Each structure stands twice: as C-alpha cells, then as structure tokens.
From Swiss-Prot:
It is a single-pass membrane protein. Pathway: Secondary metabolite biosynthesis. Belongs to the cytochrome P450 family. This is Cytochrome P450 monooxygeanse terK. It comes from Tolypocladium album. The gene is terK. GO terms for biological process: secondary metabolic process. Heme binds at residue 465. Disruption phenotype: The disruption of the whole terpendoles biosynthesis cluster abolishes the terpendoles production. It is found in: Membrane. Its EC number is 1.-.-.-. One of its GO terms (molecular function) is iron ion binding.
Length: 526
C-alpha cells in the first residue's frame, strides 16, 4: 500500500528527511515541556508575588496540589502579606491574580468586551467540560432575573408559600419524637421546589422527572468541574470521555430538554393561536420573551439547557447557605429562640399573613443570614474576571494586566479583616441588625442581599449575583416555617462540624445529621 501523499511528498519521504536524532529531540522537547509544567508557575506578565510556595525552588505542581487541600491558608497568607496590592495563586484550574479591593471601583462596571464576568465564571466552573460555557453565548438568563424576576418578587410570594407548604407536606419526615435527619438533602428538596416554582411554574415544578433531572445535573456538573480543575488541561479531553459524572450530567441535560423544550413550543403555539392566552409568570417565560427571534438563544433546546444551568446555580448554592445557617443557629439556642419570636411577632402584626412585606420585617433573621454567609461563604474567591481587551488593561496605579489574565478578589479575607469588620472571629448573628438600628439611613447597606465593599460574597457592581434577592427570600421563608414547626438540636456529643475545603470552596458533609422534633405549640403560620 502506498504512503499517504501530501502535496507530492509521501510520509515516508518526509520522515526520511528528518534529522537522524529527531526522536531524541522530540522526546527532549516533551520532557522539557513536562518539567516546565511541573516546576514553573505560568508566566502571565503581572508583576505580583505568589502565595503558597514553601520555597523558590518548589515545583509548581506541588504548590497547585497543596492549594487543593489548603486553599484557605494560602489565600489568607496572601491577603495578610499583600492585601493592599495583589498576589498570585497557582491552581490546577489555572493561576489567578488576587486583587486588593481598592481596585474594585475601576473594575466593577467595565464592559464585557474588556473584562468578562461570564468568562470568569465559566473558567472557574470547569469551562466547556461542565456545559456552562453556553452562558457566554447570551445573557438572557441574567437579564431575565434582573429585569423580570427580582423587581416582581412580591408577585411570587403566594406561589413560594404555596410550594413550601406542598414541599413540607411531601418531603419532611415524620418527626413526632426526636428523629435523626440528614440536613442538606432535606433543604435541597425544600428550596429546590420553591426555586422551580419561580423558575418554571406549575405543573412542571412538581414533575418528579424534572426535579430529578435538575438535581442530577447540578450534582454531577459540580463534581465534574472539581475533577477537571484538578488535572492539567491536556488530560481533560480524555476525562471528558470516560468520567462517569460527565455521562450523568449530559444524561440529565437530555432528560431536562425532553421536558422543557416541548413546553417552550407549547407556550409559543398558544401565544400565536389563542387570543385569550395569558403568559405564565416565571423565569422560562421571561427568557423566551428576551430571546432573539430566530436566534440560537430562542431555540427550545437552548432555552431548556440555559434553564438547567440557572437552576444549578440558584438551587445548590442556596441550599448550601441554608445548611450552614441552620447548623450555625442550632449551635446557638438563645439566638434560635430570638429568631423564632421575631417570626411570631411579624406574623401577628400582619394578621397571620405571609408575604414579601413580612419577610422584609425580619431584620434579625436577615442579619443572621448575612453573618452566616460572612463566616461560611460560597467561595473564598469571588469577583472572577477574565481580561478580554487584546491590549490588556492598566490599573490606576500603573500596573498593566495582559489579555487573558484571570482576576479575582478574596471576599472572605476582606470580611474577616479586623480593619474592615470589628471582632471578625466572633459569630454575632445580630451584628447587622444592630448596625441597621443604629444607622437607619444606612439600613439597605447592611441587608443580607446587599453587595458592598465589605461584603463581596454576592459580587459587586453590574455583575453582582442576579438571584440573590430571590435566594434571600427563599431562605427566610423556609427557615421561618422550620422554626415554627420543628425543634432542632445536635445529637449528644456532637456539635457544629467545621468546614472543609476543596480548592476555594467550603463545604460540610452533606449527610451531617440533626435531631428534629415536630412542635405542637405556637401554630404553623407559614
């Protein structure tokens, strides 16, 4: 058989013309490339020191592996040394430049074309291997939350309360006596149902096949991005083929599309043919209305996939926040009773009715959630941005940041700094309640869902978390119902577990149990 011919030269001829030692040269180059990856941190042109290295001669791969298990210490070390400037961190998921918050004003509202929040999220969440890169093609999900959902949260209060009642009746275990219950799976179900009621509405929000697809998608995407970030990019295409969590999240996407895509088409048919048709009030409809007619983001399967991604971000992060908060509260029985009394008082003042206005009166609970988030953030790093300007950007102090650089800020370090927050090591559940009482004209600044320079866990500026107001309302409504209906305590000899970390992400064992018992006094109220 003849060798394959390219432009008149056979492969055999081409190989014959190579230097006799080409194999050794190729091997040497590959060895050099491997050594460079193992020993040297990436060079990005930013004049900043690295945190996390034990010595100048330490291989980069060692520092990257250390970060996977000691991110909290490394980020804290960098902040302590360089909080007024910037520092770098070597990670398997890509090196980052951690900025001082003094730069935040000049960066917060930079246009997407120069500094991309979406690309920062995508890179930090597994990129193309988690499916989340779809968000870079259109921002209709973010715009739908910002313009259609958040301004109209009062209209969702009755639906949210109705779904919470349904969830409590369906998903809560029988706890007539003290019963050991895994906390996070329960909260995932309760909050997942409320979120789905707002995002997709009846009847699909109660379709167990949809709920399972959304849950499996979120769970497996999360694990996939952790695994992908832990290995060198050269191995990721192979892992993408063999990793079981990739198979599972892609299966969940297919199942989710099979449910939502026909729903999109059904709504469009009704809108075109039924003059009496009233559009549903949910996120899916908002995304449909904002999509580009005839564009990719208007296609039913594209809308379905985007919806799954928003459900992922909204559901799991809110449930994790709820788990941390309830564990913090059970550790402080006096504060628990104080919050329970506040709920009863607000309900009494509102004739037993529950709505957005009632939630806004829960100042103590709002403060408690903000304090719990301060000590148990969703991530130790935030405000992720990728420099998109081909010429790079130049900061106000003359530091030049080249194209492609991954920037971020360390919100937990900021809110743990005694120069920023008095007594930051003390958990003070009423910290922000007292600040609102003492300075009523600054009340908004200290609310749970407010993003400011001292509390950057929801981001800052134009690209702050668009679902934070919905999440805050869901958490307050759910905790209120649980406090009025159940007593909680830790098993004998147990206490609030300490947080663990994978990279910069804090977590507790999702199966952490609490003892629960149904209350038969005080009414339900919610």
């Amino acid at each position: 058989m003849n060798d394959y011919n390219v432009t008149g030269t056979t492969l055999g001829d081409a190989f014959a013309k190579l230097p006799p030692n080409w194999g050794q040269l190729t091997g040497a180059l590959l060895f050099l490339a491997a050594c460079t990856w193992i020993y040297l941190p990436a060079f990005d042109g930013v004049p900043a020191p690295f945190a996390g290295y034990r010595s100048p001669l330490e291989p980069a791969i060692v520092a990257k592996t250390r970060y996977a298990f000691a991110a909290s210490d490394i980020i804290s070390e960098g902040y302590a040394k360089w909080k007024s400037s910037m520092y770098k961190i070597s990670r398997h998921g890509g090196d980052v430049v951690v900025l001082s918050r003094k730069y935040i004003d000049e960066l917060q509202n930079a246009p997407h074309e120069r500094l991309s929040s979406i690309k920062g999220l995508i890179k930090n969440f597994g990129g193309q291997y988690s499916g989340i890169d779809l968000l870079d093609e259109s921002d209709i999900g973010t715009r739908a939350l910002q313009t259609k959902i958040t301004p109209n949260l009062t209209k969702f209060s009755d639906d949210m309360r109705d779904e919470l009642e349904y969830a409590l009746g369906r998903d809560m275990p029988d706890c007539e006596d003290w019963t050991l219950v895994p906390l996070q799976p329960i909260l995932l179900k309760l909050l997942g149902r409320i979120t789905s009621r707002v995002l997709i509405g009846l009847p699909i929000c109660r379709d167990e096949k949809w709920l399972d697809a959304a849950s499996q998608h979120a769970h497996n995407v999360t694990i996939t991005q952790i695994v992908m970030k832990a290995v060198h990019p050269i191995f990721r295409p192979f892992l993408n083929l063999v990793l079981p969590t990739v198979w599972r999240y892609k299966s969940a996407v297919r199942r989710g599309k099979a449910i939502l895509a026909p729903e999109v088409q059904r709504r469009r048919n009704l809108e075109d043919n039924d003059p009496d048709y009233v559009k549903p009030n949910d996120l899916l409809q908002a995304m449909m209305d904002l999509s580009t007619p005839g564009g990719k983001d208007s296609q039913p399967e594209d809308l379905a996939h985007r919806h799954l991604l928003i459900t992922l971000v909204a559901g799991h992060s809110t449930a994790a926040a709820g788990s941390h908060a309830l564990m913090d509260l059970v550790s402080r029985p006096q504060l628990l009773e104080e919050l329970r009394d506040e709920v009863l008082q607000v309900l009494q003042e509102n004739g037993g009715n529950w709505g957005k206005q009632s939630l806004s009166k829960l100042w103590k609970m709002d403060s408690f959630f903000r304090e719990s988030q301060r000590q148990n953030p969703p991530s130790l790093l935030g405000f992720h941005r990728i420099v998109q300007d081909p010429a790079g950007i130049t900061l106000h102090d003359g530091v030049h940041v080249p194209y492609g650089t991954h920037l971020c800020i360390a919100p937990h370090s900021v809110s743990s700094d005694p120069a920023v927050i008095p007594n930051p090591d003390v958990f003070d559940g009423l910290r922000y309640y007292e600040q609102r009482r003492q300075k009523p004209d600054e009340s908004m600044k200290h609310q749970h869902a407010t993003a400011d320079k001292n509390h950057l866990h929801f981001g800052y500026g134009t690209w702050s978390c668009p679902g934070r107001f919905l999440a805050s309302d869901e958490l307050k409504m759910t905790l209120s119902a649980l406090l009025l209906r159940y007593d909680f305590k830790y098993p004998d000899g147990s206490s609030r577990p300490t947080n663990k970390h994978i990279d910069e992400f804090p977590y507790v064992d999702p199966e952490t149990p609490l003892l629960m018992r149904r209350r038969h006094q005080g009414g339900t109220g919610v």
